[in-house]
Each structure stands twice: as C-alpha cells, then as structure tokens.
Amino acid sequence: MMTIRNSHPLIKIVNNSLVDLPAPINISTWWNFGSLLGLCLITQIMTGLFLAMHYTSDIASAFNSIVHIMRDVNNGWLIRIIHANGASLFFICLYLHTGRNIYYNSFNQISTWTMGVILMFLVMGTAFMGYVLPWGQMSFWGATVITNLLSAIPYLGNFLVQWVWGGFAVSNPTLTRFFMIHFLLPFLIIGGLLVHLLFLHQTGSNNPLGLNSNQDKIPFHPLFSYKDLVGVLIIMSGLLLLSLLSPFLLGDAENFYPANPLVTPVHIQPEWYFLFAYAILRSIPNKLGGVIALVLSVSILFILPLSSKFKMQGNQFYPFNQIMFWVFINLVIMLTWIGARPVEEPFIIMGQTLTCSYFMYFILNPMISYLWDYNLN
C-alpha cells in the first residue's frame, strides 16, 4: 500500500527531494552546507519580515525606527541582531559551500554551478541593500561609493547613477527603492534555489571520491537528515552565542551615528564578507578597471567548467592543485584583511600583489592539472 508521501502530488515532490532522495553513501560533512544555506535563508526571511513591520524607509525616520526596534519592540533587539549576524553566517556557509565545490570539481555539473553563481550574486545584492537600510554613516557612504561605481561605465554611467539614486544624490528615493528590492530579492532567491535543486537532482550529488555512485546510494533520510541536524545545531548555537555575547562584533562602529552627508568617515568599507572584492576594486588605479575587476572577482567562477578539464574528478587526486587551492583560500583571507586596511603603503602594493595572485589561480590551476594528467599518461 502506498503511503501518503508517495501518493499525494505535493508531498511526493518534498519526499523525493528530502526523504527518498538517492544520496551517495560516502558524502562527508562538507555536503551539509546546502541545507545550512536553506536554513539561513529561512531565518533571514522570518526575522526580516518582523523587522519590516516596524521599519520606516524614510531618511528622516529610518535611523530612529532602528532605535525603536532595538528599544521598544518586544524582543526587537534579538530579531535585529539575529538578522544582522545571520547575514554573516549566511556568507560563511556560502563561501564554504563554494570552496567545497571548487575543491571537488562539482562545477562540472554546469547547470547547477551556473545557477549557484547567479544565486551568489543575488545574495550579495540583497546583503548590500540591507546594509544601507539602517541609514547610519557607513550605510550612507557605502551606498554612495558603491553605487557611484556605475559612473565608470562609458556613455551611460552618469545616467545610470542618477537612475539608481532617483535624484542627484543618495536620498529618500534611494532608500525607498533599496528597501523594496531588499524585501523582494529573497523571494527571487527562493525561486533560484528551487531551480538550483532541480538541476542538482537531475544529475545527483558529487561525492568525495569523484566516482559514479549510482551503484551505491541510500535514501537521504534518516542518515543524512540527522547528519544535517548536527550541523544545524552547531551553526544555530554559534549564531545565538555571537548574537547574545558579542552582537556588534562584525558590524561597523560608524553605523551608530545617523547618516550625515557633510561628514565623511575616515575609512569607508563594506561589511566583512565583501572586503575581498573591495580590496580587488581598490587595487586597480583606474576606475573602470577597478569596476571590471570587482565584477570579475565573482563572475570568474562562471568560467571554471569551461577552463578546467580534469581527467579525474576532484583536487584530491592532484597534489599540486591541492597546494594551489589552499594558497587560493589564504589569498581570499588576506584580501579580506587588506580590504579593511587604510589606502596607504604597504597595503596598496600588498593588495595589488594579492589581486594578481587571485586571478592567476584561475589561469594556473587548469594548466597544472593538465601537466599532472600528461605525466600520468
């Protein structure tokens, strides 16, 4: 007799994705981050909806509405802090998830990978819009600096900047549209996520050995669902500990001041999870070149399926590529650190060196793997 989870049209879809999904028996903890990203997205949407009920998207009262949420709304302080630190957790999981896919060459599943990179852009856009909403000093100047980069586009630049701003400066129309886009994008991300999962379940998951696992798969539940629950408990515990013990650790002190167009902060910088891209932007002396490098810092991930033709699936079989990969991870960490430093020597030359090294990885890595395959033959 068929159970309801196998017969009901809607429940059957969920069942085939979460319960009876055939999963490789040997996938490790590194495969947990997909479900953790889903959890982060749900957490952000739930906390965001409650914040939107009390937030006012008007430059005269936006900052005060945040103060109102923190002081007067029942548990508003907790909701806001979980939402702010949840974004950091989201990006930690996102970067670990991306790093794992690069290491194990999961980008060979081209449709899934392409959709994943598009989702990364959408999440980055959502986070940037959200950073502007408190209308503190760093919110205002961050929005001014980043949106002003559009002016580097030939011919259309100035028109695009004024179109995004809704005027001749970052002002009320800018805040209103940023709030609207910040509210809508997560729902677009949910749609993209479903497409991402659809593509993934067409081919099945990769595994640490990089071998075809069709002969040796088990249902996702109960083993992997309980395994994912361990990850959920760990990251949610970490999020709560951070939010309750040191809630503003990852924020910027400048944002405790209301936005003032007449006073420029000493060091304008985005949130920590964008600092690697910001360091790449700053390392190019030319404005247009910097914008191109900024976009390429993430969009270069699109070329990985085209440039990397490994005979074996995954860096675990390529010792020199493993070294290259961990050097690349260290480059990203160092770029993040450089992005938070002032624009002065020796940080300028260090940023330029690290930027060159960052992009060289995507050129050298396929060449080294080709040489290794050639030697094995």
Curated annotation (Swiss-Prot):
Keywords: Electron transport, Heme, Iron, Membrane, Metal-binding, Mitochondrion, Mitochondrion inner membrane, Respiratory chain, Transmembrane, Transmembrane helix, Transport, Ubiquinone. GO terms for molecular function: metal ion binding; ubiquinol-cytochrome-c reductase activity. Its main location: mitochondrion. The keyword Membrane applies. It is a multi-pass membrane protein. GO terms for biological process: mitochondrial electron transport, ubiquinol to cytochrome c. It comes from the Eukaryota. It holds the Pfam family Cytochrome_B. Heme b b562 binds at H83, H182. Its cofactor is heme b. Binds 2 heme b groups non-covalently. It is found in: Mitochondrion inner membrane. The chain crosses the membrane at residues 33-53, 77-98, 113-133, 178-198, 226-246, 288-308, 320-340, 347-367. GO terms for cellular component: mitochondrial inner membrane; respiratory chain complex III. A ubiquinone binds at H201. Heme b b566 binds at H97, H196. The keyword Acetylation does not apply. Component of the ubiquinol-cytochrome c reductase complex (complex III or cytochrome b-c1 complex) that is part of the mitochondrial respiratory chain. The b-c1 complex mediates electron transfer from ubiquinol to cytochrome c. Contributes to the generation of a proton gradient across the mitochondrial membrane that is then used for ATP synthesis. Belongs to the cytochrome b family. Heme 1 (or BL or b562) is low-potential and absorbs at about 562 nm, and heme 2 (or BH or b566) is high-potential and absorbs at about 566 nm. The main subunits of complex b-c1 are: cytochrome b, cytochrome c1 and the Rieske protein. This is Cytochrome b. It comes from Tetrodontophora bielanensis (Giant springtail). The gene is MT-CYB.
